[in-house]
Each structure stands twice: as structure tokens, then as C-alpha cells.
């Protein structure tokens, strides 16, 4: 898919990886709906982008993605404003082992809800023109993380859901590709949360172990994750792909050979 002229919806877009995604898409010529619960950060993000891009190229919508009604209204507003939806990036995420229900609701349930809402607008079965859905996972979705079991579970769930939903694409003829991104540690506010008891709960005493892992794996810039996003969108052969991004190996893919023949293009 060529990004130029397309309409994208990015959750968690006001800062960090989400903002890098928005900037990357805008540089490629897309129009972007900036969706975030943080009103102040969202307004500042929109204002900053307006200085570099035409103001009509972006739309900020405050939304708690864990609220199904708000999320549904957000999709409606985006399509009403831009007239279409071609790209969905389910990026919003948190790290909270203490309030683990919140972590699952935002990291996993909202991704599933967002995907189905996106399909309502993009699927050829529903009169859409097809599109691409990218879900944000993590290397924690590919391996156990003793200090963050719930965060880890949510990211594993994203991979299982994305691969399965992508497999169903050919069976359902939706015309919508789905892929996931699994970066290592990224320089965002989530890294700061590992030092807060209100986020880590009983695992706060293991913060030193996580910091040791950071030293081992290194820390990525959000812009590198945005480069991976563009690759997943533009390569029409990628469906059900799980992209890994690390400081040591850059952008590469998890190797799977488990898809039945009927699901392969």
C-alpha cells in the first residue's frame, strides 16, 4: 500500500512511539487522526505538527481506548472528518502490574476492539476498500518477563490475536492485512514507570533486574519503530508478520512456519 493520500488512525499518538508513527505517516503524505486520552499532550502534539504539516492533515481526538463507546465514537469522527479509513495503528499501551485489569483492558482488549472497529470500515465485506492494521506488541510478547507478568501476557495476546486474525483475512476476503511490531526497550515514558510502585506493585523490588536488561538489550529511538511501521504498511506481501526491532539486529522478523496452507497467499 502506498501511504501517500491515505487516512490513518493512531492510538496513543500524543507522545512516544505513537507520535513518531504520526510523524512518519505524515512525512509519507498520509492524513492522521491523533487519538490519545491525554488532552494536554494531544493538543500540544497537534499544534507542533501543524507547524510542519498542513493543519487539515491531522485531527486530534481525546479518547480513553478502554471505553468501548468512546472508541466507537472516535472511529465515527475520523471517518466523518476524513471521509475514509485506510490504516489503523493500535499503539496505546501502559505498564501497570498493580492495576493489572487496566493493563489488560488497554493493552489487549482495546487492540481487539479497535481491530474489529477498523474492519467495520475497511473490510471489503462491509463495503470498504481494504487496508492495513498494525498492532503494537513487544519483545515481551515473545518471551517470559518475570518482573512484568501481566504486561507480558497482554503482549503475548496481541501476537496470538494478530496472527490468527491475519490468517482469517484470506478466508473472509476482507482485503485488510494485519501485522504486529515487537520492539525491545524504547525511549518512552513506559521506561520511567518501572521505578514507580503504583505501576510495578510487588515487582518494584526487581527494578534493578529490568535496568540490567536495558543495559544488555540497549534502548531504541521511537523513530526506528516508525521506520518499521512504514515497512509493514507498504509491503503488500506482509500479512500476519511479527516484526522484531532490536539495537543489535535492527528490523527483522520472527520466523514462524505454523500457518496452514489455506491461510497462505
UniProtKB/Swiss-Prot annotation:
Write the Enzyme Commission number(s) for this entry.
1.1.1.141, 1.1.1.-, 1.1.1.232
**Source species:** Cavia porcellus
Q: What is this protein called?
A: 15-hydroxyprostaglandin dehydrogenase [NAD(+)]
User: Does the record bear Ribonucleoprotein in its keywords?
Assistant: no
* Reaction equations catalysed: prostaglandin E2 + NAD(+) = 15-oxoprostaglandin E2 + NADH + H(+); (15S)-hydroxy-(5Z,8Z,11Z,13E)-eicosatetraenoate + NAD(+) = 15-oxo-(5Z,8Z,11Z,13E)-eicosatetraenoate + NADH + H(+); (11R)-hydroxy-(5Z,8Z,12E,14Z)-eicosatetraenoate + NAD(+) = 11-oxo-(5Z,8Z,12E,14Z)-eicosatetraenoate + NADH + H(+); lipoxin A4 + NAD(+) = 15-oxo-(5S,6R)-dihydroxy-(7E,9E,11Z,13E)-eicosatetraenoate + NADH + H(+)
An example molecular function term from Gene Ontology annotations: prostaglandin E receptor activity
Q: Which GO terms describe its biological process?
A: ductus arteriosus closure; female pregnancy; negative regulation of cell cycle; ovulation; parturition; prostaglandin metabolic process; regulation of prostaglandin catabolic process; thrombin-activated receptor signaling pathway
Q: Which UniProt keywords apply?
A: Cytoplasm, Fatty acid metabolism, Lipid metabolism, NAD, Oxidoreductase, Prostaglandin metabolism, Tumor suppressor
Q: Which GO terms describe its cellular component?
A: cytoplasm
Query: Top-level EC class, please?
Result: oxidoreductase
Which residues bind substrate per the record? 138, 148
At the top level, the lineage of the source is Eukaryota
Q: Which Pfam family, just one, is annotated for this protein?
A: adh_short
Assembly and interactions? Homodimer.
Record keywords: NAD included? yes
Active-site residues annotated for this sequence: 151
Amino acid at each position: 500500500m502506498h501511504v501517500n493520500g491515505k487516512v490513518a488512525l493512531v492510538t496513543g499518538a500524543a507522545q512516544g512511539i505513537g507520535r513518531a508513527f504520526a510523524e512518519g505517516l505524515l512525512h509519507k503524505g498520509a492524513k492522521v487522526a491523533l487519538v490519545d486520552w491525554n488532552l494536554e499532550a494531544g493538543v500540544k502534539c497537534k499544534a507542533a505538527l501543524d507547524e510542519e504539516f498542513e493543519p487539515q492533515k491531522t485531527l486530534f481526538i481525546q479518547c480513553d481506548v478502554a471505553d468501548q463507546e468512546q472508541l466507537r465514537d472516535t472511529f465515527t469522527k475520523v471517518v466523518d472528518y476524513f471521509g475514509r479509513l485506510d490504516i489503523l495503528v493500535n499503539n496505546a499501551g501502559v505498564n501497570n502490574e498493580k492495576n493489572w485489569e487496566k493493563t489488560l483492558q488497554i493493552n489487549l482488549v482495546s487492540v481487539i476492539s479497535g481491530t474489529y472497529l477498523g474492519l467495520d470500515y475497511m473490510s471489503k465485506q462491509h463495503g470498504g476498500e481494504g487496508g492495513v492494521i498494525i498492532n503494537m506488541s513487544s519483545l515481551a510478547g515473545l518471551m517470559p518477563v518475570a518482573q512484568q507478568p501481566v504486561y507480558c501476557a497482554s503482549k503475548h495476546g496481541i501476537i496470538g490475536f494478530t496472527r490468527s486474525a491475519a490468517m482469517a483475512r484470506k478466508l473472509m476476503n476482507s482485503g485488510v492485512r494485519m501485522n504486529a511490531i515487537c520492539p525491545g526497550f524504547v525511549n518512552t515514558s513506559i521506561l520511567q514507570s518501572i521505578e514507580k510502585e503504583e505501576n510495578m506493585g510487588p515487582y518494584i523490588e526487581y527494578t534493578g533486574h529490568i535496568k540490567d536488561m536495558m543495559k544488555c538489550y540497549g534502548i531504541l529511538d521511537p523513530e526506528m519503530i516508525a521506520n518499521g511501521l512504514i515497512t509493514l504498511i507498504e509491503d503488500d506481501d506482509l500479512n500476519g508478520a511479527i516484526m522484531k526491532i532490536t539495537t543489535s539486529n535492527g528490523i527483522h522478523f520472527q520466523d514462524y512456519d505454523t500457518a496452514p496452507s489455506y491461510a497462505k497467499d
